[in-house]
Amino acid sequence: MPIRYISQKLAQQIDVELMSASGAFSLDQLMELAGLSCAQALAKSFPPTKHKHVMVACGPGNQGGDGLVAARHLHHFSYTPTVYLPKPSSKDFLQRLVKQCENLNIPILKDVDAFQTELAKSDVILDAIFGFSFQPPLRKPFDQVLKAIKGVSKKIPIVSVDIPSGWSVTDGPQPLWTEEDDKGGKEMIETFEPEVLVSLTAPKEGVKAFKGQHWLGGRFVPDELGKKHELNIPPYEGIDQVVELPRNH
């Protein structure tokens, strides 16, 4: 049976079930496993011998938390990661992830100009900005961030976490509008298409047409939960935290 592509509503429901009394996971446990999956997928696609410098672009929410975890693991996998985190969260568990990166001397940038400078020096980008809960319009500074990543996307490969930033979780890639400025004007921003996608738990409906290399990560879904929602998750091999899905042609 082919793997199931799930809706935003079902993705949220599965998260709730995983963190319920019967699922027994905590949010930071799931984030740790998700971030490890992303780091391993990037390592399989872009080994550190040729892609040592990784720009990890993080949003303010749980997607950014996955990126922070991945940055820590990438450091231990012999990469040189740099984190861009313009809007650090006030949540304790996310602040601890930042501190863990700082303890490894992983640079954490907040300024968009510094981000653009370091982006140009990167060998690969890990896109952990927006997840399946993102709702337009696009707010500062992420309008500049997405434009910058789009601008280098033909030269520097992108690995996106769960869903490429700015894509509709239902309909896939679409133009994004920024929020209105002081004069009532707004700008259309084109989204980028990554070379590699790491879906978490199960792929989302909006990536059905994705044609790049596609990994599934998040090796934490109990068999009964997978059967209940007919996810048809393929088996993971050995100690791997990711499994490659068939490419669309």
UniProtKB/Swiss-Prot annotation:
Its EC number is 5.1.99.6. Binds 1 potassium ion per subunit. Its cofactor is K(+). It comes from the Eukaryota. One of its GO terms (cellular component) is mitochondrion. Its main location: cytoplasm. PROSITE patterns: YJEF_N (PS51385). InterPro entries: YjeF_N_dom, YjeF_N_dom_sf, YJEFN_prot_NAXE-like. It is an enzyme of class 5 (isomerase). K(+) binds at residues 63, 127, 165. One of its GO terms (molecular function) is NAD(P)HX epimerase activity. Residues 11-233 form the YjeF N-terminal domain. It is found in: Cytoplasm; Mitochondrion. (6S)-NADPHX binds at residues 62-66, 131-137, 162. Keywords: Cytoplasm, Isomerase, Metal-binding, Mitochondrion, NAD, NADP, Nucleotide-binding, Potassium. It catalyses: (6R)-NADHX = (6S)-NADHX; (6R)-NADPHX = (6S)-NADPHX. NCBIfam families: yjeF_nterm. PANTHER family: NAD(P)H-HYDRATE EPIMERASE. Belongs to the NnrE/AIBP family. Catalyzes the epimerization of the S- and R-forms of NAD(P)HX, a damaged form of NAD(P)H that is a result of enzymatic or heat-dependent hydration. This is a prerequisite for the S-specific NAD(P)H-hydrate dehydratase to allow the repair of both epimers of NAD(P)HX. This is NAD(P)H-hydrate epimerase. It comes from Cryptococcus neoformans var. neoformans serotype D (strain JEC21 / ATCC MYA-565) (Filobasidiella neoformans).
